[in-house]
Amino acid sequence: MRLTFAMFVARLAGWTSHTLLGKSGETIAGRVLLVLCPNAISQLSVGRKIILVSATNGKTSTTRALAGFMSTAGSVTTSKSGSNLARGVASALMTKSEYAVLEVDELHLPFVVDATKPKAVLLLNLTRDQLHRMHEVKRVADRWKEMASKSDATFIADIDDPFLNYVLASASNNVRVSFGGMAGRHPDGAVCPSCGAYLDWVGGMYSCICGLTNQVSDKKFSAESAAMRNQILANITAEYFGVPWHEVDLSTLERKVSKKFINADCSIRLTKNPASWREALAGVEGEKVILILNSREVDGIDTSWLWDVDFSGLRGKHVVVTGERGLDLAYRLHVQGVLAELVPDFDSATAKFAGPVEVLAAYTAFFELVG
C-alpha cells in the first residue's frame, strides 16, 4: 500500500514537472518516490531481470544501445534522460517490464547493486573524474571490488583497464574482455591497484609481478574507438541473455548535437573530465573551435585536471574560449602554445564564426545549449 501511494504521488510530481516546467520529470519523480518509500528500488526490482551499466565515460550511450538490443528479447525499462543517481533508478523502475537496463553513477553503483540484485553488471572504464566528488580512482575501484565480492551478478568488463581487472578478481561470476590493449597507457595506471607495484606497460598491454594482466581474457576483440568498444561490450552483455549480435551506427552513440546559433552551425560535444576531453579533442577535424568550461557542482569545482589534457592538437586553429572558468582554460592553452581568444559568453563566441563550428562544452553548458 505504501509503495502504491508513493508511486501515485511520484508520478503526479513528475507529470507536473514535465507539463509546467518542460523538464523530463524523472528526477523529481524518483526523489519523491524514495522520500515516501525509501526501499522502493528493492521492491520494484523483485521478479525482474536487471542489467546495470557504469563507467566514468560512455554510460548513457551504451545504456541506450543495450536497452535497444534487449528490446528484442522482451519489454525493457530504461531512463530516458540519463538520470543515473538512485532517484533516476527509482523513477525508471516505476515502469513495469521484464528487463530493466539502468545507467548508474559510479559512487551509487554499490548501493544500487545491493538494492536491485542485478543479473548482470557492465563496467566500461574507470578513470579520473571530479576529484571533489569522486576522489581518486583507486578509492572508487576499492568500493567496486567490495561490491563485486558480495554480489551474485555476472560482471562484464573491459580488462584493458587495470582498475576493472582488479575489480573483477573478486567477482564470483565474470566475463573478462580485452581489445588487445588500450591506446597507450591508462592515465592513472602507473601502479598496480592490487599490490602497489609498478605496472609493466608495453603499448596498451600491462602485467604485474602479482599476476594482474590483460594478456589473458575470456573474450578478445579489436576496436578502433571507445564507442566501438562500448558497442561490443553492450553486445556481449545482451548475448549473455540470449540476444543475437547487433550492429550499430557508432555515430548514434556519441553525445553530440548539431544546432545553429546565428550564423554558426555548431556541432556540440559533451566534455566532462580528462578522458572525455581527450576523446573529444581527438575528434576535432575543423579549423573553428569553441571551448566552454564551467565550474558548477556537477562540472567539478577543481579545474586542476586541465593539466592532464593535451591540447596541442588545437595549435593553428581558430579557438575561442568562454565559460565561468574560461580564463583558467585560456591560460592552460597559452602554456601549451595554443592561441585562443577569451570572450564573456557563448553568444559572443558564436558571433566570431560563420559556417561549421565544433563546440566542446562542459556538462552544464552542454545541456543549456541543447535544451
Sequence positions of predicted segments:
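ATP-dependent carboxylate-amine ligase
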Residues: 1-30, 46, 189-196, 210-212, ...
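Adenine nucleotide phosphate-binding catalytic loops in nucleotide-utilizing enzymes
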Residues: 173-277
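Phosphate-binding loop of NTP-binding sites
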Residues: 2-178, 185-187
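Residue-level signal for inorganic ion chemistry
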Residues: 124, 156, 230, 234, ...
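Buried hydrophobic packing segments
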Residues: 66, 70, 89-93, 233-241, ...
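Short, compositionally biased "basic patch" segments
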Residues: 51-72, 249, 253-255, 276-281, ...
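Glycine/Thr-rich phosphate-binding loops of Rossmann-like dinucleotide-binding domains
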Residues: 110, 131-132, 165-166, 202, ...
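Short, solvent-exposed loop/turn segments at secondary-structure boundaries
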Residues: 132-137, 236, 302-304
